[in-house]
Amino acid sequence: MSPRTFEEQTECIVNALLTDFLGPAWEVGNRTLQCEDESDSGEVSSFDVAIIAGRLRMLGDKFNGELEASAKNVIAETIRGQAGIVLQNTVKSLSNAWCAQDSSLAYERAFLAVSVKLLEHVARMAPEVARQVVRPITNMINGNTAIREYIQGQGGWENLEG
């Protein structure tokens, strides 16, 4: 069954990204969401988590800012149980800085790119902590009205370009 809500889709996508970044040796999460691309009626849905995750990785690859210090800070705060606020502030700050350098860049695209790239850095630097960052990243995307409206304005996750 395909994820129905925006929130479920976001969770599937962030988990798929983490699986990509960590590789098959790591199990992701303790909650299994159905992320297949078939609906209850047997119709194939346009929601393909692998394609969407790939597009987001391409988007993230466009960000070439320095993330080492930010990732270390997110890792440290995640270990202390404070991932949510630090993650939001870090992504917001890096996204704003990137947009200031490139006036043609939509803030929402920068936000998504930085989120993906930061998750990739955390996964590479501290794989055991990366799983704890999935929920805060998912909540950050789901809870940001501007990001949500941007994605829905594109026609949903499945129409987001990399």
Swiss-Prot record:
Keywords: Apoptosis. This is Bcl-2-like protein 15. InterPro entries: Bcl-2-like_sf, BCL2L15. The keyword ATP-binding does not apply. The gene is BCL2L15. Signal peptide: none annotated. Disulfide bonds: none annotated. Gene3D superfamilies: Blc2-like. The keyword Membrane does not apply. GO terms for biological process: apoptotic process; regulation of apoptotic process. One of its GO terms (cellular component) is nucleus.
